Design a protein with these regions (language model features):
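N-terminal "cap/leader" segments of large eukaryotic alpha-helical scaffolds
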Residues: 1-24
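Eukaryotic acidic, Ser/Thr-rich intrinsically disordered low-complexity regions
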Residues: 2-3, 114-145
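Buried hydrophobic core positions in alpha-solenoid tandem helical repeats
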Residues: 5-7, 41-43, 73, 77-81, ...
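Short inter-helical turns and helix N-cap capping residues of alpha-solenoid HEAT/ARM repeat scaffolds
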Residues: 13-15, 49-51, 87-88, 125-126, ...
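Residue-level signature of alpha-solenoid helical repeat scaffolds
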Residues: 23-24, 59-63, 97-98, 135-139
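Flexible loop/turn segments at the boundaries of HEAT repeats in alpha-solenoid HEAT proteins
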Residues: 27-37, 65-73, 102-113, 143-145
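Helix-adjacent hinge/juxtasegments
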Residues: 48-87
Length: 145
């Protein structure tokens, strides 16, 4: 399947279908490097106005960590960073969770990830969400050490 068709299916108007397809790619990515060369294509969608789409592509990039080489993730990390400060706390939490893959398979990125997540401004989130994000940050920091 060509890259354009993959992207088209991942941004399908039917969010449920697009989400299921993204899950399938995530599962496949644990077994094969079939999608690793799509990291730049995935990164091009990180600024989409739809938070579901932005998050979906952030997670898919992280899913490629085990196969990435030649700084493939490092080269797009600046495009990924804004999602870690997204106004929607669920976006931030999902992205923090996805970064566990990167820390596991790309230990050379631990310092840049730690620096990035340590600067997340928790004060912009409701009192009910800020502690959960803080917990996610702490878990990721511990894994990165």
């Amino acid at each position: 399947m060509n890259n354009n068709l993959v992207i088209k299916k991942l941004i399908d108007k039917d969010d449920k279908q697009a989400y299921e397809y993204a899950k399938r790619i995530g599962i496949e990515s644990a077994k094969t490097n079939k999608y690793v060369d799509m990291i730049p294509d995935f990164a091009s969608m990180l600024q989409d106005k739809n938070s579901f789409i932005r998050t979906r592509f952030f997670i898919l990039i992280c899913d490629q960590a085990r196969w990435a080489s030649n700084n493939q993730i490092e080269n797009v990390f600046d495009q990924m960073k804004p999602l870690l400060n997204d106004p929607k706390p669920t976006v931030v939490r999902q992205c923090l969770n996805a970064l566990h893959e990167v820390i596991l398979f790309r230990p050379e990125m631990c310092d840049v990830i730690k620096n990035t997540i340590s600067s997340i401004d928790l004060s912009i989130y409701k009192d009910s969400m800020a502690p959960l994000i803080k917990k996610d940050i702490d878990e990721l920091m511990n894994r990165a050490d």
